[in-house]
Structures are given as structure tokens and as C-alpha cells.
């Protein structure tokens, strides 16, 4: 049976660390930021770790070879 392909949308959105955690970028920074405070915009920088169950699902269904 051939290997499952990685979903290309998931490749762009998620990154798996060496310890197996799944990182993702914060949502809500594309548009409409005029109504947010500077503090809110600043706190949306960087990446966050997905919850373990969500990360397991992402690895199983979208990033099978990660």
C-alpha cells in the first residue's frame, strides 16, 4: 500500500516539532485589525502549540508522514 500524501493546506499551516508537538500561527491577523488594540495585535504574533488531541488528529489525518 502506498504512503498517504500530506495535505498541502496542512503543510502551510502546521509545523511538527522534534518532540512531536504541532505548532500553528495565531488566527485573526489578516484584516479588521483597526478595531483591535496595539496590545491585542502584539499578542497575536508568533506561533502557539495545539492541544494534544487536536495535534494528534492533525498528525494522523493531515500530516501522516510527519
Swiss-Prot record:
GO CC terms, sorted: cytosolic large ribosomal subunit
Pfam families registered for this protein in UniProt: Ribosomal_L35p
Regions crossing the membrane: none
GO biological process: translation
GO molecular function terms attached to this record: structural constituent of ribosome
Keyword set, alphabetical order: Ribonucleoprotein, Ribosomal protein
Domain of life, per lineage: Bacteria
InterPro entries for the chain: Ribosomal_bL35, Ribosomal_bL35-like, Ribosomal_bL35_CS, Ribosomal_bL35_sf
Record flagged with keyword Ribonucleoprotein: yes
UniProt similarity note: Belongs to the bacterial ribosomal protein bL35 family.
Listed NCBIfam families: rpmI_bact (TIGR00001)
Name this protein carries in UniProt: Large ribosomal subunit protein bL35
Amino acid at each position: 500500500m502506498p504512503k498517504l500524501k500530506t495535505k498541502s493546506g496542512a503543510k502551510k499551516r502546521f509545523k511538527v516539532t522534534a518532540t512531536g508537538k504541532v505548532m500553528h500561527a495565531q488566527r485573526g491577523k489578516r484584516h479588521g485589525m483597526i478595531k483591535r488594540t496595539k496590545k491585542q495585535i502584539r499578542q497575536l504574533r508568533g506561533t502557539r502549540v495545539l492541544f494534544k488531541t487536536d495535534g494528534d488528529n492533525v498528525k494522523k489525518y493531515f500530516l501522516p508522514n510527519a
